[in-house]
UniProtKB/Swiss-Prot annotation:
Coiled coil: none annotated. It comes from Glycine max. Keywords: Nodulation, Signal. Residues 99-120 are annotated as: Disordered. Pfam families: Nodulin. Induction: During nodulation in legume roots after Rhizobium infection. This is Nodulin-23. GO terms for biological process: nodulation. InterPro entries: Nodulin. Belongs to the nodulin 20 family. Residues 1-17 form the signal peptide. Transmembrane segments: none annotated.
Amino acid sequence: MRVIVITVFLFIGAAIAEDVGIGLLSEAEAYVSPKLKKFITPCTSHVGETCSTTSSSGSEALMQNQGGLLFAFRFYGEMLGRPCAQLYQTSVTNLQVEPSEVFPRKNNPQGGRKSKLDDHQVQPLSFRLPPFRLPPMPKLGPTSPIIRTIPSPPIAPRDLSLIETIQLRTALRTCTHVTARTCLTAPNVATSDLEACLTPSMNQCIYPRGAEYGSPPIRA
């Protein structure tokens, strides 16, 4: 009974914290604890890329309906209540156009200044493992015991806990609002590349410079 009461109070406190005005948070205050990075990192670049792709039909359409990009950001922020991996996989499957086709990259002229976005690639995170050689299998004779291999059960993806889900949604909702407001109020919004604004702005919101426990901004 005591555990149930404590859980209810934690849920109420987290819900109240989520409803606190988003406009009161600055970019630095939107930073979340490092243990949530593993949930935010795979989603951040995909949110920016997908929302920028939906608004890539032209700067004129964007200027006529500036709420379109904000709506896309809010939609993805609300959908992040589900497990991040499931949302990421579903969204990638539903994409009809590759971001590289929507935003073609021009080759950097020789001697020109190279931007960090020139190496931009939209791919899920991958881990490189060192090469590992299996030991040679022993030769089995007619009198050798029978070796039975028991397959290990598949590892199911871990769902976010209630508190982690609320914290993640709050952080992403705050950062998407900051990103949309920053990119849509830029003086050259009609002629600038939205992709060049969305990804760095989202990175800066989640991983602000000078954060005590922060890591270098991720590259989408």
